[in-house]
């Protein structure tokens, strides 16, 4: 049987199966077929708004014409639109404008009664028909983008859509399936996972596969000179032009972490290039014992506590994975740089000007403190320099006094887990518990895919597990382990909704450049290196350490 005949047969079977399960499809529906190569935004064909039999006939005629004599496209997806509902245009416009987070309107839209102009939810965002100027500016319908999308999509000319003159539109949900390995994979309908595949029953295997795919994506972002391609806004394949020392180093760190769950010797040349880039471009020695990592543009260079910490974490992880001490001298000088930014009470200074070394900002962002504490502890475990441990203990006195648990920060969770391995004192465990216990509701209701929440929860989980192993019953009972496990499962599942599976990537300008990347939906479908590293770290911890209900 030819590839085309297999595809045609599978499509018929899928449509029959959908009809059996969805009585509402007996009413008017629309069929959509999205198709395209790996390196271009997909095209989308649609049937008329009609009964299923008529729509199916139109679809089969189209696929005969499109694919019978030529190879199937790399990506093919079918959608059945249902719940076609007439709504006042102004109501939908306001709904989109007042969303709590951008780009979370999850319905398709038809712009006339017959839906002769209609777009799937994925098309609406892939073509920036709904967009925001930034993550903190409200969404709006872009009339120019809408009319350009209409012109691109339909062969026959369509009248110009003037948003101010619209009275009603028709919204709809879809049942969809993606054609992969000669079969159709069902995709979720509605809510946060709309239009993407379900997590397989073997969850760890599914996440392991995500790690493998995403680490390959992140590895591919390292250029020959060792610098990362920093990121893209996916809809129009626009590069994000900034760069950042902290994110460079922590992205290499996450790529090194992947060696804990997979063996990828082919990654080493680019990892070495990325480390070399960091040490030649950002590393500056103040004297023979002290070094700092610089960040920023020419004329605006600065020294960040977090950049020194990120570089130490990267180089210490390299030493842990390879058992080679090639970079230890750099790590020790960078640690001395951190010690210069911490006073005798454990209070930190976050940012200095470079090359003057004068104060720029005493405090910039909470995560520098936890990151610095973790970096010192990682080096302490390599060289046993007691100054490092004593400094972290002083820092923790400040964290506890200033009630830093209110920030539910992932780096604080990491460094607390690390410190309690070395100094298992109650006060440190209690701080670690409070870092997540007071934020259960916030985490449960968080409808964005920022990946640091899973990292924070997994570091806490490892710490709580040690309480259990050590028989510290009173503290363990305060940990609410069943609730913590539920939250971990929830976040691990939820964060897959920000992964560019092919069924989502195909609607963006260059699917091949963002396939298997993690993205931030509410910030213009942003793909940035730190979005990859945080997700990788969280999922690696889940695959390696999470036991769930296992005995």
Label for each model-derived stretch:
Residues 243, 424-427, 432, 442-551:
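CBM-like carbohydrate-recognition segments
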Residues 48-209:
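Extended, non-transmembrane interaction/recognition domains
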Residues 1, 34, 38, 312, ...:
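Membrane-proximal envelope and lipid/glycan-remodeling enzymes
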Residues 216, 221-250, 254-379, 389, ...:
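Extended ligand-binding groove/face enriched in aromatic
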Residues 160-161, 209-227, 269-289, 329-349, ...:
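Long, well-ordered core segments of solenoidal/helical folds
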Residues 190-204, 249-265, 310-324, 371-384, ...:
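Well-ordered alpha-helical scaffold segments within catalytic/enzyme domains
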Residues 206, 242-254, 301-313, 363-374, ...:
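Aromatic- and histidine-enriched alpha-helix N-cap/loop-to-helix transition segments
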Residues 2-48:
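Charged, amphipathic alpha-helical stretches
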């Amino acid at each position: 049987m030819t590839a085309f005949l297999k595809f045609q047969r599978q499509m018929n079977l899928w449509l029959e199966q959908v009809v059996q399960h969805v009585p509402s499809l007996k009413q008017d529906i629309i069929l959509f077929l999205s198709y395209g190569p790996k390196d271009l935004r997909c095209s989308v064909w649609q049937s008329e708004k009609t009964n299923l039999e008529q729509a199916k006939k139109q679809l089969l005629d189209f696929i005969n014409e499109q694919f019978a004599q030529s190879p199937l496209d790399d990506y093919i997806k079918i959608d059945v639109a249902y719940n076609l509902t007439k709504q006042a245009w102004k109501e939908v416009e306001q709904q989109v404008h007042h969303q709590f987070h951008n780009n979370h309107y999850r319905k398709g839209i038809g712009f006339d009664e017959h839906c002769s102009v209609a777009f799937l939810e994925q098309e609406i965002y892939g073509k920036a028909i709904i967009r925001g100027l930034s993550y903190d500016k409200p969404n709006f319908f872009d009339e120019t983008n809408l009319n350009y999308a209409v012109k691109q999509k339909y062969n026959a000319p369509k009248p110009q859509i003037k948003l101010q003159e619209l009275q009603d539109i028709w919204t709809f949900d879809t049942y969809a399936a993606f054609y992969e390995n000669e079969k159709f994979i069902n995709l979720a309908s509605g809510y946060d996972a709309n239009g993407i595949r379900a997590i397989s029953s073997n969850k760890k295997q599914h996440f392991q596969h995500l790690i493998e795919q995403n680490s390959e994506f992140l590895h591919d972002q390292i250029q020959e000179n060792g610098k990362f391609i920093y990121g893209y806004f996916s809809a129009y394949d626009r590069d994000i032009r900034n760069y950042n020392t902290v994110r460079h180093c922590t992205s290499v760190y996450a790529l090194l972490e992947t060696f804990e769950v997979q063996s990828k010797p082919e990654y080493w040349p680019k990892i070495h290039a990325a480390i070399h880039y960091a040490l030649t471009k950002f590393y500056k020695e103040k004297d023979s014992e002290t070094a700092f990592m610089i960040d920023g543009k020419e004329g605006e260079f600065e020294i960040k506590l977090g950049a020194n910490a990120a570089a130490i974490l990267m180089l210490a992880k390299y030493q842990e994975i390879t058992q080679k001490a090639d970079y230890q001298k750099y790590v020790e000088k960078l640690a001395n740089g951190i010690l210069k930014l911490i006073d005798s009470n454990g209070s930190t200074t976050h940012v200095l000007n470079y090359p003057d070394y004068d104060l720029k900002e005493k405090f910039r962002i909470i995560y520098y403190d936890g990151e610095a504490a973790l970096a010192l502890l990682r080096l302490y475990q390599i060289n046993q320099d007691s100054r490092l441990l004593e400094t972290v203990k002083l820092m923790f006195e400040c964290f506890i006094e200033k009630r830093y648990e209110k920030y539910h920060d992932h780096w604080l969770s990491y460094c607390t887990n690390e410190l309690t391995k070395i100094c298992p004192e109650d006060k440190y465990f209690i701080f670690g518990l409070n870092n997540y216990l007071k934020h259960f509701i916030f985490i449960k209701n968080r409808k964005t895919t920022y990946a640091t929440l899973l990292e924070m929860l997994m570091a806490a989980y490892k710490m709580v597990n040690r309480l259990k192993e050590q028989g510290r019953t009173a503290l363990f009972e305060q940990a609410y382990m069943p609730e913590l496990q539920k939250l971990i499962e929830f976040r691990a599942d939820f964060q897959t909704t920000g992964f560019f599976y092919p069924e989502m990537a195909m609607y963006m300008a260059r699917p091949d450049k963002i396939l298997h990347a993690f993205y931030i939906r509410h910030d213009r479908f942003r793909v940035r290196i730190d979005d990859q590293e945080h997700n990788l770290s969280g999922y690696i911890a889940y695959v390696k350490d999470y036991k769930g209900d296992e005995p």
